[in-house]
Swiss-Prot record:
GO molecular function, one term: heptose 7-phosphate kinase activity
Gene: hldE
Region annotation Ribokinase: where it falls in the sequence: 1-319
UniProt keyword Signal present: no
Record-linked InterPro entries: Bifunc_HldE (IPR023030), Carboh/pur_kinase_PfkB_CS (IPR002173), Cyt_trans-like (IPR004821), PfkB_dom (IPR011611), RfaE_dom_I (IPR011913), RfaE_dom_II (IPR011914), Ribokinase-like (IPR029056), Rossmann-like_a/b/a_fold (IPR014729)
Pathway: Nucleotide-sugar biosynthesis; ADP-L-glycero-beta-D-manno-heptose biosynthesis; ADP-L-glycero-beta-D-manno-heptose from D-glycero-beta-D-manno-heptose 7-phosphate: step 1/4; Nucleotide-sugar biosynthesis; ADP-L-glycero-beta-D-manno-heptose biosynthesis; ADP-L-glycero-beta-D-manno-heptose from D-glycero-beta-D-manno-heptose 7-phosphate: step 3/4
Name the record gives this protein: Bifunctional protein HldE
Organism placement in taxonomy: Bacteria, Pseudomonadati, Pseudomonadota, Gammaproteobacteria, Vibrionales
Function: Catalyzes the ADP transfer from ATP to D-glycero-beta-D-manno-heptose 1-phosphate, yielding ADP-D-glycero-beta-D-manno-heptose.
Alphabetical GO biological process terms: ADP-L-glycero-beta-D-manno-heptose biosynthetic process
Binding residues annotated for ATP, in chain numbering: N195, L196, S197, E198
One term under GO cellular component: cytosol
Gene3D superfamilies: 3.40.1190.20, HUPs
């Protein structure tokens, strides 16, 4: 079964953690300062992005999820900038604003794609009264499906054990991006997402997958977790769940440019996917694909559902193969975002012959992507009568998917594909034979939507019915 995106509009997530503002100063450098042996950067562009728990929330909002963010800030310009940016992205902000603390701010000076220096403006929020955050968390639990605790060891999660208990008592899964070696404070969490270095600081050095799995399950047992997702850079990710076989996911990153904020993206996609109804295993696959996208970007970054869909389906020139209707709609949406022309045709294709191959090759030349809608077995029998189809639908679709001209093959159960075509609305609908455009199923809907209908000729002498008659008659 192919992996598909959930409807993130159904996801509601509470994010609690260390909120930061990431600032970037960009500019060229071409000389050394006369005052000291350091490069001089001429700042030409300034950019501000939410960081830490705020970046987690922003990632969820970018996918279309509903997110409530709770954390600590100062009463200052960075806090105002964060609130304005996040509110504009439909993040519900619930900041505990403290006058005696500065909002955590990290300033990076960038030149020629490289980070020259980072300056941190922070004092942390250690020792803050737990009564400031816990009531806000508790009040929010009835409105969300999952909870993320984003720990950067800055003080917002100083009372994390109490937070976990409140959420778990309310029946909410708790996902934690941990910090430090004290995993005891995370006892009872649903899932932790340590990177390999963080994992080894607690479990000890690992030299093989088997050793990682063994030590990971020991941690799950010791700290009463339900699962661990260990992120392993170029080696991908490993999901360990109680009572389940380990799931090793290879990295999907094509290029690693900047890992800043990648962990935020992983946990945001993971928790929002579960909130939208995905299994933990499928949510981890989506998070793995998302990580492969954001590490190719500079700085803390988000990704769209279009980018995530592209990462899942890949970009193989040979096409995407047999696909369900829901998946097809997502794939077509991606193609349209790319500006590609989508061509669609349909048929029984009971015995694929040279005429079919030539016809499909011609159809493929008319656009960038070719969809072939195939009658199901019951549909073929209703059209052709007893004894048909000769080949069951899974085999017919597999053969079609193997053709280089074909991108997607999708089944339909009705007598005609009119409903399917009216929902896909390709740029170009084609059909082979002696049809008139106005008589082709779905043609009127395609034309009404601004598309085109075209009739292509079949190669003379090629007929599925004649081939079947010849075989049954012992000829050929």
């Amino acid at each position: 079964m192919k992996l598909t995106l959930p409807d993130y509009d159904q996801a509601s997530v509470l994010v609690v953690g260390d909120i930061m503002l990431d600032r970037y100063w960009y500019g060229p450098t071409g000389r050394i300062s006369p005052e000291a042996p350091v490069p001089v950067v001429k700042v030409e562009q300034i950019e501000e992005r939410p960081g830490g728990a705020a970046n987690v929330a922003m990632n969820i909002a970018a996918l279309g999820g509903h997110v409530h963010l709770v954390g600590l800030t100062g009463i200052d310009e960075p806090a105002k900038a964060l609130n304005e940016k996040l509110t504009s992205l439909d993040v519900r902000c619930d900041f505990v604003s403290l006058p005696d603390y500065p909002t955590i701010t990290k300033l990076r000076v960038m030149s020629r794609g490289q980070q020259m220096i980072r300056l941190d403006f922070e004092e942390g929020f250690h020792g803050v009264d737990k009564g400031l955050i816990l009531p806000r968390l508790e009040q929010s639990l009835t409105h969300v499906k999952t909870v993320i605790l984003s720990d950067y060891a800055k003080g917002a999660l100083e009372h994390v054990s109490a937070m976990i208990k409140l959420a778990r008592d309310a029946g909410k899964p708790v996902f934690i991006d941990p910090k430090g070696t004290d995993f005891e404070r995370y006892r009872g969490a649903t899932l932790l997402t340590p990177n390999l270095s963080e994992f080894e600081l607690v479990a000890g050095k690992v030299t093989s997958d088997d050793e990682l799995v063994e030590k990971g399950f020991e941690l799950i047992e010791r700290f009463d977790f339900e699962a661990l997702l260990v992120t392993r850079s170029e080696h991908g990710m490993t999901l360990l769940q109680k009572g389940q076989a380990p799931l090793h996911l290879p990295t999907l990153a094509q290029e690693v440019y900047d890992v800043t904020g990648a962990g935020d993206t992983v946990i945001s996609v993971l928790a929002s996917s579960v909130a939208a109804g995905k299994s933990l295993a499928d949510a981890c696959k989506l998070a793995n694909a998302a990580a492969g996208v954001v590490v190719a970007k500079l700085g803390t970054s988000t990704l769209s559902t279009i980018e995530l869909t592209e990462a899942i389906y890949g970009s193989q020139d040979s096409g995407y193969g047999v696909i369900a209707e829901t998946e097809l709609k997502q794939a077509v949406s991606v193609a349209r975002q790319r500006g590609e022309t989508v061509v669609m045709t349909n048929g029984c294709f009971d015995i694929l012959h040279a005429g079919h191959v030539a016809y499909l090759a011609e159809a493929a030349k008319l656009g960038d992507r070719l969809i072939v809608a195939v009658n199901s077995d019951s549909s073929v029998q209703g059209l052709k009568g007893p004894g048909r189809p000769v080949n069951p639908e899974d085999r017919r679709m597999a053969v079609l998917a193997g053709l280089g001209a074909v991108d997607w093959v999708v089944p339909f159960t009705e007598e005609t594909p009119q409903r399917l075509i009216s929902e896909i609305l390709p740029s170009l609908l084609v059909k082979g034979g002696d049809y008139k455009p106005e008589d082709i199923a779905g043609g009127k809907e395609v034309i009404a939507a601004g598309g085109e209908v075209r009739v292509l000729s079949f190669e003379d002498g090629c007929s599925t019915s004649k081939i079947i008659e010849a075989i049954r008659g012992g000829k050929g």
